Structure formats: structure tokens, C-alpha cells
Amino acid sequence: MEVKIFRVKGTFEKGGKKFRFTKEYRALKPEDVRELVFSDIGSKHRVKRAKIFIESIEEIEPVEAENLVVKRLSLELA
């Protein structure tokens, strides 16, 4: 199986306010990315999974990645 890059867009609620986010992850499948988002945002912002709303998970090419760590890892290993 090949590791792919995914871009995730969504929102989360904290303290009655909504915050938008865009994250990029390396994973095998979209289901893995979904769990990474819940884990990452939940731990950093102390938000429950029910307050995290994922709008889209899209697969992108390594050159499209904005996160430099994800981009370099993907280009070096390709």
C-alpha cells in the first residue's frame, strides 16, 4: 500500500465560537486521516469529537502540499 497525502478542511466549536481549520496528513486511507484529525484537534484544543466537523477530505499531490514537513517527507520518499 502506498502512503498518500490528504488535505482536511472543517470547523470545530469551542466556547460558543466556531473555528475553521485546514490540515494536511500522510496516511494510507481517508478513515485514518479522520482519526488523526479528531486526535490532533481534540488534544491541542481540548475539544470533544462531537464538536469537530469535517467538511472535506481530499487526496492531493505532494507538490500541492502547503505543510513543509509533509511535502518534504513525501518528495524524499517518492
Curated annotation (Swiss-Prot):
One of its GO terms (cellular component) is ribonucleoprotein complex. Keywords: Ribonucleoprotein, Ribosomal protein, RNA-binding, rRNA-binding. GO terms for biological process: translation. Gene3D superfamilies: 3.10.20.10. It comes from the Archaea. Transmembrane segments: none annotated. GO terms for molecular function: large ribosomal subunit rRNA binding; structural constituent of ribosome. Coiled coil: none annotated. It holds the Pfam family Ribosomal_L18A. Belongs to the eukaryotic ribosomal protein eL20 family. Part of the 50S ribosomal subunit. Binds 23S rRNA. This is Large ribosomal subunit protein eL20. It comes from Thermococcus sibiricus (strain DSM 12597 / MM 739). The gene is rpl18a.
